[in-house]
A protein has these predicted regions:
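Asparagine-centered polar/low-complexity signal
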Residues: 3, 50-51, 138, 173
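Gram-negative outer-membrane beta-barrel transporters
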Residues: 16-32, 48-133, 175
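C-terminal beta-signal and adjacent terminal beta-strands/loops
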Residues: 128-136, 143-145, 151-200
């Protein structure tokens, strides 16, 4: 097993709109024996446990956090990206030797933008997952399309009698994207959620 990692972090403060910037990146390389994964079998709600033998995993995780302030308005932006190559190296004679393991994308990422003003919070999030395969062989029959989705939420926070009241309205899958996290299990189209919480 081999591991490599690096991290960079910055904490930049300024009197103008730009307040803070954090950057980080981590690289890794692992060889894992008897890696167990779960993936959906032929029947609905039934998952199969699979021992992959030996898996070679290389990857990079990177993130960026930025904070801005414009008078009473505060803004935060967070970006994340992952590249991961996880391949089965158990037996060179296997047809799936050095194929990407099931349901692990090579590319994935997210972006979140938030604006806060006098107890109000507006948040937008975008999630992307790249192409994957539903079984050990990386063939067109097992190909799973990339997917992405956007969510939007509005939150109001009130302090009443030393208690914190939070009301949130969410729009999930804002643009009605058709996508499947798991093959043949379509996710909901645009949907809504309202919630209220009280912190005593």
């Amino acid at each position: 097993q081999a591991n490599a990692g690096f991290t960079y972090s910055g904490n930049y403060l300024h009197a103008g709109p730009f307040r803070k910037l954090n950057l980080s990146a981590d690289g890794y390389w692992n060889k894992v024996k008897d890696k167990i994964i779960a993936y959906p079998g032929g029947q609905q709600f039934r998952w199969t446990m699979l021992n992959l033998g030996t898996v070679d995993i290389k990857g990079v995780d990177a993130s960026c956090d930025a904070f801005f302030s414009f008078g009473p308005v505060e803004t935060a932006v967070k970006l994340q990206y992952t590249w991961q190559k996880a391949v089965d190296v158990t037996d060179p004679d296997d047809t799936f030797y050095k194929n990407q393991i099931p349901y692990v994308p090579k590319h994935s990422g997210s972006a979140v933008a938030s604006i806060y003003y006098k107890g109000w919070g507006l948040n937008y999030s975008f999630i992307y997952t790249g192409e994957r395969y539903s079984n050990k062989e990386n063939t067109w029959r097992n190909y799973v399309l990339p997917w992405y989705t956007s969510d939007l939420s509005l939150q109001k926070t009130l302090n009443i009698n030393k208690k914190t009241l939070k009301a949130t309205a969410e729009i999930n899958n804002l643009f009605g994207q058709d996508y499947e996290v798991v093959l043949n299990y379509p996710m909901p189209k645009t949907n809504f959620r309202l919630s209220v919480s009280i912190e005593l």
